[in-house]
């Protein structure tokens, strides 16, 4: 049985614990303090599988799931990869471009799995959208809009763009099968913490079917919970609500046709509700990580995708500082 170390039992780490406990793995858990290990004890994990010093278990496990603050990702991933362990790390892979690049290189050198927690890649709705876009059902995708926000407690290890905006940045890269050529962003720091709590990111993609303009809005203030993506093509459009378990997607066969001169006619088409399997994405991505450990297959959310997302976000930070569009290097 595959031996997995879960490193971190914070808010999101507790969800990893619940899902890993339901998978066919021998689970070990590490946290900085004994009190933080209580959720693992309540699930029945023995004292021999719990520690406040993760180094005690490095030699005992096949892989590690790292759910710790973003600033710790680089040193922890590096340590485990160089120790010959496969690694799943929550997004972002790192906060700095160079660190993400180094981790990808270390994973390749040591022939280790490095999977990044880009969870939306494992949502059945995402796979439907990607396939429909790639198969041409939308025609030319003119624009994509994403809003990942709502009133909640802010994270303190990064701004809202790195905490939440990264979900839709990676999602758009995945759906379009491309990276943006140009990035523009505006941030606000209403809390005065020295990090963004409102973020607007504009991305310009070149795809085989033409240019696509995408926007990602994230914040901590608007009442409610928003996980919405809208894709507008010249043949088909779709609204996807990631808050919904099964019926996330509605498609609209809306088109515009020339009506002479500068006039266009707006044609409202059939609205279709798309049903996708009600699979929990976190469980799916953890299962995929365990499968990759066994088969050595490249993960769907591999080190390169993690590096690419970090590059886009750092281009956005540069745009915020300079007030200009930044070409992705």
Predicted regions and their residues:
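Mid-domain beta-loop-alpha active-site segment that forms a flexible
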Residues: 117-124, 150-180, 196-197, 305-306
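C-terminal glycine/acidic-rich active-site capping loop/insertion
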Residues: 119, 234-304
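C-terminal helix-rich "cap/oligomerization" subdomain common to oxidoreductases
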Residues: 43, 56, 63-66, 112, ...
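Beta-loop-alpha module in the N-terminal Rossmann-like domain of NAD(P)-dependent dehydrogenases
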Residues: 39, 48-106
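Contiguous beta-strand/loop segments that form the cofactor/metal-binding neighborhood of enzyme cores
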Residues: 163-248, 283-295
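A short helix->loop->beta-strand "cap" motif at the edges of active sites that frequently abuts
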Residues: 83-85, 110-112, 209-212
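A contiguous active-site-proximal alpha/beta segment in oxidoreductase catalytic domains
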Residues: 94-153
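N-terminal Rossmann-like dinucleotide-binding module
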Residues: 1-45
